[in-house]
Amino acid sequence: MNPLIPSDGASGFPGAPWAFKRAIAQGEELKIPTWGMGDAIISLVGAIGLSLIVSLTLMSQNIDPENGWGLLIAFSAPWLALAGWPILATTIKGNGPGIDFGLLAPRTHLRLGFVAGLASLAAASLIAVIVTRFTGPLSSSAGDVGLNQTGIVLVLFVLMAMFGAPIVEEIAFRGMLYGALAKAHLNEHLVVVITALVFALFHFEPKRFVILFAIGTILGEVRRRTGSTSAAIVAHIVNNTPAALYILVTALRT
C-alpha cells in the first residue's frame, strides 16, 4: 500500500484521490462518482473546438488571436471546456473537484510536488539537449507569441502561463482524464503513461513531444503516488515558472 495514501474502503472508486479516501476514513458520506471517459473526451475535444471557434471569430473581426488582448482571449477561452467541464461534471455527478480530483491535499503532498517540479525541469533540460541534435533549436508556441507582448498584456500572459495553465491542465489531465482511466480499472502505471501521451499530443508541438511526454509522465507519477491533483499542479507551476519569467524579462528588455 502506498504510505502517502490512507486506507479507505472506496473500492467502488478505483484510483480514488487522497481527499476522497480521507473523507471516507473520517466517516463522511460520499457518493461514488459517475463521471468518466465521456466527460474527459468532452473536456479535451471541447477545448480544441473552442480554440478554433474563438480564433476564427477573432480573425473575422480583424483581431489578432496571437497578439494583445486577442491573445489573452484565445489563450484562455479553451479553459472553459478544459477545466470548466470537469468542475461541472464532478459537481453534478460526484462530490465536487476538491474531493473527486484531490484538489484538497496535505502539505507533504505539495512539498513532493515542488520537488517533482524541479525534477521535471532537470529532465526536460536533459532531453532538450538530446532532441536539439536531431531537430535543431526548440521553441514553444506560447513562448514565441509571449515575447511579442508588452505592458499589461505581457504581465497577464506570463501569469496565465505560470499559474493559470498548470491549474487548468492538471484539472483536465491528472484530474478528469486520470480519474476516468483509473475508474475504468486500467493499471495505474498505464494510466500515467496514457495521460502523459495525451498531454503531449494535446499541445500540438511535434518537436517538443518527447519533452512534453517526459514532463507529463512525472506529473502523472506525482498524482499516482500522492493521490493529489494539487501536488501535480504545484509540480506543473514549478516547471512553467522559469520559462514564464524568461518571457517576462526578455520582453521587457526589448
Where are these regions (language model features)?
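Transmembrane helix-loop-helix hairpins at the membrane interface
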Residues: 121-122, 138, 146, 150-254
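N-terminal, membrane-interfacial amphipathic/helix-forming hydrophobic leader that caps
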Residues: 1-112, 121, 125, 129, ...
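Non-cytosolic membrane-interface motifs at loop->transmembrane helix junctions
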Residues: 66-74, 142-146, 217
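Hydrophobic/basic alpha-helical segments enriched in Actinobacteria
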Residues: 89, 93-98, 104-105, 113, ...
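Alpha-helical transmembrane segments of integral membrane proteins
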Residues: 34-46, 70-74, 108-116, 153-157, ...
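Helix-boundary and loop/linker segments of multi-pass membrane transporters
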Residues: 28-33, 64-65, 102-106, 144-153, ...
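A generic helix-loop boundary/linker signal
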Residues: 47, 91, 100-101, 117, ...
